[in-house]
Amino acid sequence: MGASPVQLLIVLFIAVLVFGGKRLRTLGSDVGAAIKGFKEAMKEEPTEPEKLEQQPPVIEVVATQKEKTKG
């Protein structure tokens, strides 16, 4: 049950009437730029989390000696 080409043209015509042609062009270019930026961000390799995972955990401990009491 997909949309037929006639139905898509009607929806496009209504969108042009509501928003106007210029606004639809700018909206389309903005959406395209956002998708492009998202794809580029997904291709970049994460650097910080890998560095943190490679370092072993450090546990700091302070040792104290307890004195014996005679009682």
Swiss-Prot record:
The keyword Heme does not apply. The chain crosses the membrane at residues 1-21. It is a single-pass membrane protein. Gene3D superfamilies: 1.20.5.3310. GO terms for biological process: protein transport by the Tat complex. Its main location: membrane. Disulfide bonds: none annotated. It is found in: Cell inner membrane. Keywords: Cell inner membrane, Cell membrane, Membrane, Protein transport, Translocation, Transmembrane, Transmembrane helix, Transport. GO terms for cellular component: TAT protein transport complex. InterPro entries: TatA/B/E, TatA/E. The keyword Heme does not apply. It comes from the Bacteria. Coiled coil: none annotated. GO terms for molecular function: protein transmembrane transporter activity. The Tat system comprises two distinct complexes: a TatABC complex, containing multiple copies of TatA, TatB and TatC subunits, and a separate TatA complex, containing only TatA subunits. Substrates initially bind to the TatABC complex, which probably triggers association of the separate TatA complex to form the active translocon. Belongs to the TatA/E family. Part of the twin-arginine translocation (Tat) system that transports large folded proteins containing a characteristic twin-arginine motif in their signal peptide across membranes. TatA could form the protein-conducting channel of the Tat system. This is Sec-independent protein translocase protein TatA. It comes from Dichelobacter nodosus (strain VCS1703A). The lineage of its organism: Bacteria, Pseudomonadati, Pseudomonadota, Gammaproteobacteria, Cardiobacteriales.
